From Swiss-Prot:
<dbReference type="InterPro" id="IPR005358">
    <property type="entry name" value="Puta_zinc/iron-chelating_dom"/>
</dbReference>
<comment type="similarity">
    <text>Belongs to the UPF0260 family.</text>
</comment>
<protein>
    <recommendedName>
        <fullName>UPF0260 protein YcgN</fullName>
    </recommendedName>
</protein>
<dbReference type="Pfam" id="PF03692">
    <property type="entry name" value="CxxCxxCC"/>
</dbReference>
<dbReference type="InterPro" id="IPR008228">
    <property type="entry name" value="UCP006173"/>
</dbReference>
Length: 153
């Protein structure tokens, strides 16, 4: 029987979210862009509605922020997901690695940490590149409310 050393086990399987380095934490993000879609909240019920309206800093084709390191200078309301506030974002998709690992679940087979690229994620249509429109092209965000996506269940 072959022995497995701790270094053979991927960091996300041997460390808790709190034990991860900042670089490991950042690498958990699959880059789907779902966090970068604007959400609307009903003022009376606090229900969150998902839109296909992407932040103006999101490159929709690559699903990457144009200014990730300086994003708060460009978008002061951009979210910063941390170990401390992870559970404040109940709307995180069911496919989100942060959510999955916090719930004790494995990463999906298409995750870039497992496949080495984002191609499988895009192929599974997990990313927003197939549905997103840039906020600069939208007049009324309410016209862009999506039926609750399956990833929001």
């Amino acid at each position: 029987m072959a022995e497995t050393s701790m270094s053979d086990i991927p960091f996300w399987q041997r460390k808790t979210l709190d034990e991860m380095t900042d670089a490991e934490w950042e690498s958990l993000c699959d880059g789907c862009g779902q966090c970068c879609l604007h959400k609307l909240m009903d003022e009376d019920t606090d229900e969150i509605y998902f839109t296909n309206v992407a932040c103006r800093q999101l490159n929709i084709k690559t699903c990457q922020c144009r200014h990730y390191e300086r994003r708060f200078e460009f978008e002061p309301d951009c979210i910063k997901l941390t170990r401390e506030n992870l559970f404040d974002f109940a709307w995180l998709p069911m496919t989100c690695a942060y959510r999955l690992l916090a719930e004790g679940k494995p990463l999906p087979a298409w995750h870039p940490l497992l496949t080495g690229s984002k191609a499988a994620m895009h192929g599974e249509r997990i990313s927003v590149r197939h549905i997103a429109v840039n906020e600069s092209e939208v007049r009324d965000w309410q016209d862009h409310i999506l039926n609750k996506p399956s990833w929001a269940d």
